[in-house]
């Protein structure tokens, strides 16, 4: 029997904790493991060595620190979890990971961009809703 998977996206905000608690409920209900995703900013491309390498290490450390409490909470709840720290924009990469991992469900927060940029680009949640191959649960 294939293991069921739920993709859970976190951005490190306080709202991410609500997303995790909701994901725990659904993971238990579906007997599913969690693919925990955090998308960090792109690595700088204009810096030369060794500054670029230092920037990459700093970015990855911040991402690992950000995702750690969410991974810990899932493990405390006895949910199997796999971490994915991704460079690409969240709205593009979340549906791709869900497809590759054959996820049953994506759990995301309702928070989106609220500035002028958000009007033109749309929110991460909106993009995920319209491009994902599976069901999406939006946590308010």
Positions of predicted regions on the chain:
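Gly/Ser-rich helix-loop-strand patches that form or flank binding pockets
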Residues: 25, 96-140
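Generic structural signal for helix capping and beta-alpha/helix-loop junctions
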Residues: 44, 91-93, 115
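Conserved beta-strand positions in the Rossmann-like core of class I SAM-dependent methyltransferases
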Residues: 35, 82, 137
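Short glycine/serine/threonine/alanine-rich loop segments
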Residues: 31-33, 79, 103, 134
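Structural beta-alpha unit
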Residues: 1, 72-106
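A short acidic, glycine-rich active-site loop
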Residues: 53-65
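Small/aliphatic-rich secondary-structure junction motif
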Residues: 2-50, 73, 77
């Amino acid at each position: 029997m294939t293991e069921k998977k739920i993709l859970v996206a976190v951005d490190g905000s306080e709202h991410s904790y609500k997303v995790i608690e909701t994901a725990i409920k659904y993971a238990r209900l579906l007997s599913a493991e969690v693919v925990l995703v955090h998308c960090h900013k792109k690595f700088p491309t204009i810096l030369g060595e060794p500054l670029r390498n230092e920037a990459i290490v700093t970015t990855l450390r911040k991402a690992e620190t950000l995702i750690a409490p969410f991974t810990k909470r899932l493990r405390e709840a006895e949910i199997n979890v796999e971490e994915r720290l991704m460079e690409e924009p969240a709205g593009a990469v979340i549906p791709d990971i869900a497809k590759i991992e054959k996820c049953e469900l994506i759990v995301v927060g309702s928070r989106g961009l609220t500035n002028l940029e958000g009007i033109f680009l749309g929110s991460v949640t909106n993009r995920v809703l319209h491009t994902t191959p599976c069901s999406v649960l939006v946590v308010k």
